[in-house]
């Protein structure tokens, strides 16, 4: 029975190379399709794959062909309709029209746009391409280092459970080859001499017997070389290395006053989901802290954060104070990469906005990697926006954007996290 072993890198997915080439070639068209599709999804369906359509005009290959008109001589294969010197009428030009996407001919046949499915990973790669986390610094603790075990080559000492059989046998083969190479070479020379004496006249029996004894002694010496020796043994070596902190926490602060309707909350939720997916691709562990506020702030779970009917007036500083308390209790800035995203319609008690400015400037912004504020409203900006504009001018880790419609969410998100020119890729 014959066994075939497929050692190709893409053996299980033989078209992967062509697929990757296609994604690179038509990246701009695919990104345009994704940017439009992100706004049509439900808030719980941001992480799945996507069906992408590309107009046929964008994927047509350039070809060399004869232009229209002119006099040309062609050689056609023979058939039962024409004979030599017959004149063939020019076919009429296509007059079919189309009111939709794709191409339509005069006989009713057409061609749809090219549609294909991209996977979740491909979708997220294109969704977050050219984006980077601002002020990204993986924490390296001095007192509370996190250690992770890594492979670190091989060692000649160790426990039996870590023995490397393959490396040990390789060393055994090298040692036995080195120790017996001279003896095997001598045996080959003696065997050649023995053949010469056997064919020589007169026959030298004593000399032949002496050579046979030498060959036997050499083979005994070769057999006495141990197959495996403690010198050959190699063990897999492991070492513990300090790891930079790879954990982050996102504080989601949302105004739930009476002016924040469900449509506004859904737009805020889309932003929070994009932020979570973006951070989870950078950090291994991402915690979410949900804080709702009206006149009072409360930490809640995800369901209550988006769907609770509790409402009231608006005091934004209550959420900022609660965020500071949670950081002190559970999230040491030396161990956690802290991010915050605040969503509001901008409506706040006028006397509270200066307090929000003070809390952010003196208490929160020194602790967080990045603080983003989105104001979802079609009205004119109020005191909270003006206070935050001063923070944006003073702090590099503070950013703010204005959202009017659902279509603004993804472009605004890219503006907040666009990779800076001086950041390494």
From Swiss-Prot:
Organism field: Sodalis glossinidius (strain morsitans)
PANTHER family linked: UPF0229 PROTEIN YEAH
Top-level taxon: Bacteria
Record field: compositional bias (Polar residues): 50-59
Family statement: Belongs to the UPF0229 family.
Biased composition (Basic and acidic residues): 77-90
Positions of region (Disordered): 49-109
Protein name from the UniProt record: UPF0229 protein SG1344
Disulfide cysteine pairs (residue numbers): none
Biological classification of the source: Bacteria, Pseudomonadati, Pseudomonadota, Gammaproteobacteria, Enterobacterales
């Amino acid at each position: 029975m014959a066994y075939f072993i497929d050692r190709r890198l893409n053996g299980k997915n033989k078209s992967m190379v062509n697929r990757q080439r296609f994604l690179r070639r038509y990246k701009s068209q695919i990104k345009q399709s994704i940017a439009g599709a992100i706004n049509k999804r439900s808030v719980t369906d941001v992480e799945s794959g996507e069906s992408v359509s590309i107009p046929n005009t964008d994927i047509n290959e350039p070809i060399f062909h004869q232009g229209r008109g002119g006099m040309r001589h062609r050689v056609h294969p023979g058939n039962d309709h024409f004979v030599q010197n017959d004149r063939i009428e020019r076919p009429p030009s296509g007059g079919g029209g189309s009111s939709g996407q794709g191409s339509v001919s005069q006989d009713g046949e057409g061609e749809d746009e090219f549609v294909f499915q991209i996977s979740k990973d491909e979708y997220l790669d294109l969704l977050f391409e050219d984006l980077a986390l601002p002020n990204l610094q993986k924490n390296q603790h001095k007192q509370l280092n996190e250690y992770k075990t890594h492979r670190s080559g091989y060692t000649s000492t160790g426990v039996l459970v870590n023995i490397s059989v393959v490396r040990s046998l390789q060393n055994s083969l090298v040692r036995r080859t080195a120790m017996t190479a001279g003896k095997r070479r001598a045996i080959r020379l003696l065997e050649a001499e023995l053949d010469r004496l056997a064919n020589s006249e007169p026959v030298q029996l004593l000399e032949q017997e002496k050579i046979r004894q030498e060959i036997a002694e050499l083979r005994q010496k070769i057999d006495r070389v141990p197959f495996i020796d403690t010198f050959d043994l190699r063990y897999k070596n492991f070492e513990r290395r300090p790891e930079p902190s790879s954990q982050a926490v996102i504080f989601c602060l949302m105004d739930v006053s009476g002016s924040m309707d469900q449509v506004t909350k859904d737009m805020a939720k889309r932003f929070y989901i994009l932020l979570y997916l973006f951070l989870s691709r950078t950090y291994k562990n991402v915690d979410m802290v949900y804080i709702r506020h009206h006149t009072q702030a409360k930490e809640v779970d995800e369901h209550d954060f988006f769907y609770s009917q509790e409402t009231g007036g608006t005091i934004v500083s209550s959420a900022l104070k609660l965020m500071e308390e949670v950081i002190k209790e559970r999230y040491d800035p030396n161990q956690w990469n802290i991010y915050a995203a605040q969503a509001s319609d901008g409506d706040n008690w006028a006397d509270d906005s200066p307090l929000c400015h003070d809390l952010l400037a003196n208490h929160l912004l020194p602790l967080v990697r990045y603080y983003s504020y989105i104001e979802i409203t079609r009205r004119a900006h109020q005191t909270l926006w003006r206070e935050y504009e001063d923070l944006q001018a003073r702090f590099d880790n503070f950013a703010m954007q204005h959202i009017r419609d659902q279509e603004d969410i993804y472009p605004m998100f890219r503006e907040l996290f666009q990779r800076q020119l001086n950041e390494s890729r």
